[in-house]
């Protein structure tokens, strides 16, 4: 008897990640699944629960859930919703679990397990945990042996990330979700097999046409995730690519916050422009002294003029925007989840800096699953070096050419596996069966 509780079983990141999985698990012979809606039933609400988050409402809800006599209770949004977070403070089932739909520890002694993915933790967690990739690799070999298939079981964690959680980490081999979403319909220019429908000649002509058009760098994350440390990256992209246009979201419900962010970003962009103009003047002066002629002139028109803000879009409009983007930018230290998944689902390259994330490296894991590759450990550098690498990667992949074609082709070919929770390196299926089996195995073992 397994219960899943959330205030977001609707058009919300948590609901979209879990509903497909629940539909599968409800047909499992070995599980009796209870779906517990902790919302007020009002679309767009914060999930105030049965009449509110007061003590009486919490007591009533806790008694109702306890009466189900569940073996396991899985929470989808602890930390995102006040009511479900209040529920999670109580012991309503012998075993209680949190899902990575909200990527961080609950810090509660009443939550026993945190379900995540090898693609989000593994060697990807090395720099965040302050360990080198070599140390993580040694631990992985000692735990299972080189080349062994990862085993999904209660306690299947490595120690590089465990210290950051009050719960015991349970790392599934795949992503742990089934994302069946009709809104994610590829544009008609893409073939049914996920490859571009154009001929090589047509693609070359399109690239020639794109060579001098503006390049769209899109960051579709909410304002809460726009950390000051990320401002320098946005400014650096504008300075590095004279054709770059950066598109950011603007929410009318956060006008004061937005105005402060706008001023802060403007200051970073202006500083980058001054540095770029100084470098250009120095280069021209050196060229004149050496008799080689002028190399380039300072930037004219202003970098800030290439920053655009758009109001929130509908689901389909949002997806189409990401399909039109040349590259999607994942911010740090708190990056995207479902929005990154959507970008990868339409074959748009995503650039991220996993080493600068303070939570699970969701974007790196999703990229690995979409491109059907293994996540590899990497040497960790000073944060400024990672920012420089981020800018260089974004500019390189946004430009027309072989790299852009290669990345988009790989993402489109791996689309089905990504949406159905498959793991990187060929470790996940494309029909959701592997994800269903992972969850059934974990739930059965946890209840034993």
Model-inferred region functions:
Residues 45-52, 143-146, 286-297, 421-430:
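Intrinsically disordered, low-complexity regions enriched in glycine and serine
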Residues 9-29, 174-284, 297-313:
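Conserved catalytic-core segment of nucleotide-activated headgroup transferases in glycan assembly
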Residues 72-83, 87-108, 315-362:
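A donor-sugar binding/catalytic signature common to diverse glycosyltransferases
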Residues 4-47, 51-68, 72, 244:
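Phosphate-binding active sites in nucleotide-utilizing proteins
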Residues 165, 322-323, 327, 331-421, ...:
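Catalytic binding pocket for nucleotide-activated donors in carbohydrate/polymer assembly enzymes
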Residues 53-59, 307-321, 335:
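Conserved active-site histidine-acidic residue motif and adjacent donor-binding/catalytic loop
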Residues 221-222, 252, 260-263, 284, ...:
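C-terminal amphipathic helix plus adjacent low-complexity
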Residues 91-195:
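Active-site-proximal region of nucleotide-activated glycan assembly enzymes
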